[in-house]
């Protein structure tokens, strides 16, 4: 994949990505940061940590700002991914809740596959 995800709002990174037509998902959390990321040209605001306020926060942000794409990360798992999508997230990102470090270290592909399937089923249930 050719894209950039930033941990924080970095207008200079957004500008550089726009110059080279690279999609950029800018880190943001507060409504001000989210709007600033969008106005700077980010394709979406990466809302982190999403688990802090949960799907209700995404829904609350989308109400007055329906034009801004939100990408919740941090605390997204197979049990709540559907709730984030129903709340208005255009996509989500997951790390350790999808690929557990122990399973990766042990090359437990079955466990990783099972988690991926659980995520896929949860997402499919929303469509």
Please annotate each region the language model reported.
Residues 4, 68-71, 89-91:
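Short glycine- and Lys/Arg-enriched binding-loop motifs that mark or flank ligand-binding interfaces
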Residues 1-10, 22-34, 43-51:
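Catalytic beta/alpha-barrel core
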Residues 8-13, 46-55, 87-109:
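Glycine-rich phosphate-binding active-site loops on the catalytic face of alpha/beta enzymes
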Residues 8-30, 55-75, 110-127:
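Alpha-helix-loop-beta-strand connector modules within alpha/beta enzyme cores
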Residues 45, 84, 119:
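Conserved, mostly hydrophobic/aromatic
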Residues 32-40, 57, 76-92:
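Catalytic cores of alpha/beta
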Residues 1-3, 20-22, 101-110:
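Glycine-rich tight-turn/loop motif centered on a GG-T
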Residues 18-20, 38-42, 97:
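Acidic/polar active-site rim loop that often engages polyanionic ligands
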């Amino acid at each position: 994949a050719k894209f950039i995800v930033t941990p924080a709002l970095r207008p200079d990174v957004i500008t550089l990505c726009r110059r080279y037509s690279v999609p950029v998902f800018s880190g943001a959390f507060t409504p001000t940061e989210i709007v600033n990321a969008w106005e700077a040209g980010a394709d979406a605001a990466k809302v982190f940590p999403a688990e802090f306020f949960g799907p209700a926060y995404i829904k609350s942000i989308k109400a007055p700002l329906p034009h801004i794409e939100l990408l919740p990360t941090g605390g997204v798992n197979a049990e709540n991914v559907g709730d984030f999508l129903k709340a208005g997230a255009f996509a989500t990102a997951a790390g350790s809740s999808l690929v557990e470090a122990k399973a990766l270290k042990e090359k437990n592909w079955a466990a990783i596959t099972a988690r991926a399937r659980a995520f896929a089923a949860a997402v499919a249930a929303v469509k």
